[in-house]
A protein has these predicted regions:
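Short beta->alpha linker loops
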Residues: 42-45, 99, 117, 185
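An accessory alpha-helical subdomain
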Residues: 143-238
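Glycine-rich phosphate/diphosphate-binding loop of Rossmann-like nucleotide-binding domains
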Residues: 1-40, 44-45, 229
Length: 252
């Protein structure tokens, strides 16, 4: 099974100087195609940390397991480390990509030199990801897709990757998530019930407590639709047996 993951890179995100817009958009783009985000990591502008993280997910891809999007750090300023880190993680040198150079030259003419053209230095063997905004391409290597930190560029580039390379995965896995509200619920009293449902129905079970204004627990299951429906019957019966009342969850 292939998992989708994302890296969001940049000190400006971790410091709060910029608000992250990538996580919610990645979830939205994947969900629209019947896909799910399996994991997300935020990384600062620390080359050793970026390289180690990329190397770990690239090594997992020896089993063809993860499809990874990385947002940020592919520019040409001194705080943009992602291109070099990706090359180091892949065990290859940076090399100037002729197609990326051509795009930059077409966009900026003589202004491509001497600095903008640095953004055409990719890990050797990388493929291009077209940028519909300013033609400064992203790149991909080992099922890792590197795009700018600018949302207006990054998000259509992610869409292009999904629609071009992974359409065969769209809407392949049937998935359902359902939940109930357990009025005045106490999580510690629900643990045994949750473990029983996980074991019997092979689903993921979750509980989300809320203290104000009215204490309750959102209790639910997610996974294959038929198993989720069975699990919810068991959860509702179990909640009642524990002496709690419940109502169907309605998203606000």
């Amino acid at each position: 099974m292939q998992n989708f993951g994302i890296y969001i890179i940049g000190d400006e995100i971790l410091s709060g100087k910029r608000q992250d817009k990538h996580l919610s958009k990645a979830i939205e783009l994947l969900s629209a195609r019947g896909l799910q985000l399996a994991w997300a990591s935020y990384l600062g502008d620390i080359p050793a940390q970026i390289t180690a993280s990329l190397k770990a997910s690239m090594e997992r891809n020896q089993q063809n397991s993860d499809i990874v999007f990385s947002f940020g750090g592919i520019g040409a300023t001194p705080d943009d480390f992602t291109r070099q880190c990706a090359a180091d993680a892949a065990g290859v040198p940076l090399a100037r990509h002729a197609g990326a150079v051509a795009n930059i030259e077409a966009q900026y003419g003589e202004g491509a030199y001497p600095k903008r053209v640095l953004m055409a230095d990719f890990p050797q063997g990388a493929a291009l990801i077209p940028n519909p905004v300013n033609r400064v391409a992203g790149f991909s290597i080992h099922q890792h897709y590197f795009v700018p930190g600018f949302p207006e560029m990054a998000h259509p580039m992610m869409e292009w990757v999904l629609d071009t390379h992974y359409a065969h995965l769209f809407h392949q896995t049937k998935y359902l998530e359902q939940s109930i509200i357990v009025e005045s619920g106490v999580e510690s009293r629900l643990i045994d019930l949750m473990n029983t449902v996980i074991t019997e129905f092979d689903v993921k079970v979750f509980s989300l407590p809320k203290l104000k204004p009215n204490p309750h627990v959102e209790l639910g299951a997610k996974g294959a639709p038929d198993k989720v429906l069975q699990a919810m019957v068991a959860l509702k019966a179990g909640v009642k047996d524990l002496g709690f009342t419940w109502r169907d969850f309605t998203a606000s």
